[in-house]
A protein has these predicted regions:
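Phosphate-rich ligand and nucleic-acid binding surfaces
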Residues: 1-118
Length: 118
């Protein structure tokens, strides 16, 4: 089973849950097991059948949903004429692309680590 080493403070911030016991309870409901806590990190073992929760952002989203926590909606706008060209040659499965332009976002070491783990 995949084992994740996640920042507790980041998980609390993203899930809007400040109670570690509630977070650990929710993790157990996803067939997960808390293997240990080392400083600000929680070591979690999860089933591989839920790839959407194998990162801190996905796990936080699942915890919010499970605990029925509302979270703020972020504004977005569509561009009328996006200027993106993608060449897809001879691909029959998923010949699509999704992208976004994100502004005013804080990028720190935890965020980069999470991107690399995806």
């Amino acid at each position: 089973m995949p084992t994740l080493n996640l920042s507790i403070s980041e998980l609390m911030e993203l899930s809007y849950v400040k109670d570690l016991e509630k977070i650990m309870y929710a993790i157990r409901q996803f067939k997960g097991e808390v293997k240990g806590i080392e400083g600000d990190n929680i070591i979690v073992e999860l089933e591989p059948d839920r790839p959407d929760i194998l990162c801190v952002e996905g796990l936080a989203r699942a915890i919010r949903s499970f605990l029925e926590i509302c979270y703020p909606k972020f504004p977005f706008s569509a561009f009328k004429n996006p200027n993106i060209e993608v060449y897809v040659g001879n691909v029959k499965l998923r010949p699509y692309i999704a992208c976004a332009i994100i502004r005013d976002m804080r990028i720190d070491n935890n965020f980069i680590k999470s991107l690399m783990n995806m």
